Amino acid sequence: MAGPLLLVAGGSGIVPLMAMIRHRRAARSTVPTRLLYSSRTAEDIIYAEEMDQLVATQPGLGIYHTLTRAQPHGWTGYARRIDVDMLREVATPLGSALRSYVCGPTSLVESVADQLTALGLPADRIRTERFGPTGGTL
């Protein structure tokens, strides 16, 4: 696993990125890795307990949450949709050689990819996986 890595997920888009984080753990990798995960509410955070455990035990791993709907009392994470300022704050410590993987709803993935490009990350260092309605009816 070459790095550093910036992983960005929205909703259930966390599933393939968690597989990458688990692989990182299994390989005993210390590649600097940051995950920025957008959820509607704290109750919608998939793998919340596992993420807490991983951050506590995996050197070089940082996990950052943003909630777009409701934040519980005392919330210390981000409280808005992912934007260029948030990406800059999370990604800058990784340096300019980072690679990014973005997975989630189409609108989130396209927005994040555009913002990463605006921050100067070359398009060939941004990998995306998106999902959403197909638009067809049966």
Pin down the residues of each PLM region.
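Histidine-anchored nucleotide/phosphate-binding helix
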Residues: I14-A26
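Reductase modules of NAD(P)H-dependent flavoproteins
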Residues: R25, V31-L138
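The start of beta-strands in P-loop NTPase/AAA+ ATPase cores
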Residues: P4-L5, D124
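Conserved hydrophobic packing residues within short motifs/helices of P-loop NTPase cores
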Residues: L6-V8, L36
